Amino acid sequence: MKFLDLAKVYIRSGGGGTGAISFRREKYIEYGGPDGGDGGRGGDVWVEAVDGLNTLIDFRYQQHFFAKSGQHGMGKQRTGKDGAGVTLRVPVGTEILEEDEETVIADMTEIGQRVLLAKGGNGGFGNLHFKSATNQAPRRANPGQPGVERTIWLRLKLIADAGLLGLPNAGKSTFLAATSNARPKIADYPFTTLHPNLGVVGVDGTEFVMADIPGLIEGAHEGRGIGDRFLGHVERCAVLLHLVDGTAEDVVADYRTILTELQAYGGALATKPRVTALNKIDALDEQERAEKAAALQAASGFPVLQLSGVSGEGVQDVLRAVRRRIDGARQAEEATDREDTSWQP
């Protein structure tokens, strides 16, 4: 899946400082001549791909990035100080787009990659530059060049093979933390997860990327809760892992709530390959496990796996099932691509 996280950002490079109009004034020197220094250069605006980030959430709280302008020139041929630049730190996989959200300025695909977004203005010349044989005392200096101001979009594309679905507090983050190197926030209350978390999951010598999607509630496709903004991103997953809280009073109702949201959202979301699992079985006795798993299987029409993200019971079986579905989905996609690219007379 490709998570698209958009952020609108306003940037402005620094303007150049104005050149100085100044004359040498020293004792016993009657005609000192011009000594005005140049203005400092304005700061640049850069974007850099860094490690350790997987979201553009920081740009939600700060949208304006302005570099400093260069200082004005001074007497005694002193050049003004250059303005400080600004660097936007973004995750790898971020696209930089023009204001139209279509034209790509840069694609940040490697750690350490830097791209200049707005160049600072040059500083203006001081009057020292305008001295000539016919004008020994010029009273002229150049203003600095203005900075560049523009509006850009940042669009993050993170790749995940499988997405975790479930109601809030279904144990998705615990499962991801138990099976991968991800460390999502975990607590015993709903909506602990506020944005997707990615983790690399290993099983039987193979790896795939799994995303923990914020919990969905009834009416999420209409904008309720916090899951509506992620339903479109889940649509791009190859496989969905639907975790149902085994401690819930009615597991079938919980299952159908998520299924209804997928169907109401439209598209191919409801028909996407899906693995259903009964979670938190460590809190159930054998009879409760069997009854709830049977009810869930009858409602879904597919085999239902059982697991506990806390104790680890059944986790490997679930991962293997997800791995098989991912392989099947990729093979089907490759077959479709071959059909699309086949020559037609």
From Swiss-Prot:
Organism domain of life: Bacteria
Keywords (A to Z) from UniProt: Cytoplasm, GTP-binding, Hydrolase, Magnesium, Metal-binding, Nucleotide-binding
Binding site for GTP: 166-173, 191-195, 212-215, 279-282, 308-310
Keyword Hydrolase: yes
Major site of localization recorded for this protein: cytoplasm
Binding site for Mg(2+): S173, T193
Domain OBG-type G stretches: 160-327
A GO term for molecular function: GTPase activity
BP-aspect Gene Ontology terms: ribosome biogenesis
Cellular component, GO, one term: cytoplasm
Record has Magnesium as a keyword: yes
Cofactor: Mg(2+)
Obg domain ranges (all copies): 1-159
EC numbers, comma separated: 3.6.5.-
InterPro entries: G_OBG, GTP-bd, GTP-bd_Obg/CgtA, GTP1-OBG_CS, GTP1_OBG_dom, GTP1_OBG_dom_sf, OBG_GTPase, P-loop_NTPase
Subcellular locations according to the entry: Cytoplasm
Function: An essential GTPase which binds GTP, GDP and possibly (p)ppGpp with moderate affinity, with high nucleotide exchange rates and a fairly low GTP hydrolysis rate. Plays a role in control of the cell cycle, stress response, ribosome biogenesis and in those bacteria that undergo differentiation, in morphogenesis control.
Family stated for the protein in its record: Belongs to the TRAFAC class OBG-HflX-like GTPase superfamily. OBG GTPase family.
Entry-linked NCBIfam families: Obg_CgtA, PRK12297.1, PRK12299.1
Subunit (UniProt): Monomer.
Record's protein name: GTPase Obg
Species classification: Bacteria, Pseudomonadati, Pseudomonadota, Alphaproteobacteria, Rhodobacterales
